[in-house]
Design a protein with these regions (language model features):
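Catalytic cores of DNA base-excision repair glycosylases
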Residues: 2-214
Length: 215
C-alpha cells in the first residue's frame, strides 16, 4: 500500500463507521478482561452467550474467584478450551483481589503478569477499557496487514509495530476496531469480498475477488 494512501484508507473506514465498538458485551474493565480471556479461539457470539449467564451471577474478581474452577466451568463450558480458560480466569481473579484491590491494572506489564494475558489481550484492554491507542493484532488484522500491504510482517508483533508507525495519529485510537471488523466481515480469509470493499482501491491484493454471478 502506498504511503500516501494510508490516510485515505483510514478516512474511508472512519466515514463508514465513525465510532467502532468491540462486539464483546461488557460493562466494566473486569468484564471486558474476562470476556477477552474467554475469546481465544472462540467467537464473540459464543463468548457473549456464555457471559450473559455468567456476569449476572459473578462479574467481579472476588465473585468469580468464589465460584471456583468447577463452578466457573459450568458457565463457560460451551466455549472452546473452557477448562484451561477457567483456571486462568480464577487465578487472574485471585491476583486482582490480592495484588490490585480487585481492580484491573492500567499498565501493560501488570496486565501481562496475569495468567492467560498476553500482548494481544493487554492491548485490547488498554484500548477498549482505558482509551489508549494500542493495536491488538489478531488473526484478522494479521491477515489484513499482509494482504493489503498496510503492514506486512511475519509475526503479529511485526504487524503491530508497523501499524504503530504507519497509522496516522488521528486514526490510532480506533484503528484496531476498524481493521478487525473489516477483516471479520469484508476482508475474510477465503474469497475476500472485494466487490463490497470501500477501500479496495488502496489495497495491494490482486486479483480482486469479483462479485458472485447472479442467476
Amino acid at each position: 500500500m502506498k504511503k500516501e494512501n494510508i490516510p485515505l484508507f483510514f478516512a474511508t473506514l472512519q466515514a463508514a463507521n465513525p465510532e467502532p465498538r468491540t462486539e464483546l458485551e461488557y460493562t466494566t474493565p473486569f468484564e471486558l478482561l474476562a470476556a477477552v480471556l474467554l475469546s481465544a479461539q472462540a467467537t464473540d457470539v459464543g463468548v457473549n452467550k456464555a457471559t450473559r449467564k455468567l456476569f449476572p451471577v459473578a462479574n467481579t474478581p472476588q465473585a468469580i474467584y468464589d465460584l471456583g474452577v468447577e463452578g466457573l466451568e459450568e458457565y463457560i463450558k460451551t466455549i472452546g478450551l473452557y477448562r484451561s480458560k477457567a483456571k486462568h480466569l480464577i487465578e487472574t481473579s485471585r491476583m486482582l483481589v490480592e495484588l490490585h484491590g480487585g481492580e484491573v491494572p492500567r499498565t501493560r506489564a501488570e496486565l501481562e503478569a496475569l495468567p492467560g494475558v498476553g500482548r494481544k489481550t493487554a492491548n485490547v484492554v488498554l484500548n477498549v477499557a482505558f482509551g489508549e491507542a494500542t493495536i491488538a493484532v489478531d488473526t484478522h488484522i494479521f491477515r489484513m496487514g499482509n494482504r493489503t500491504g498496510l503492514a506486512p510482517g511475519k509475526t503479529p508483533l511485526d504487524v503491530e509495530l508497523k501499524l504503530e508507525k504507519r497509522v496516522p495519529p488521528e486514526y490510532r485510537l480506533h484503528a484496531h476496531h476498524w481493521l478487525i471488523l473489516h477483516g471479520r466481515y469484508i476482508c475474510v480469509a477465503r474469497k475476500p469480498r472485494c466487490w463490497e470493499c470501500a477501500v479496495a482501491t488502496f489495497c495491494d491484493y490482486k486479483p480482486k475477488t469479483p462479485a458472485p454471478k447472479t442467476a
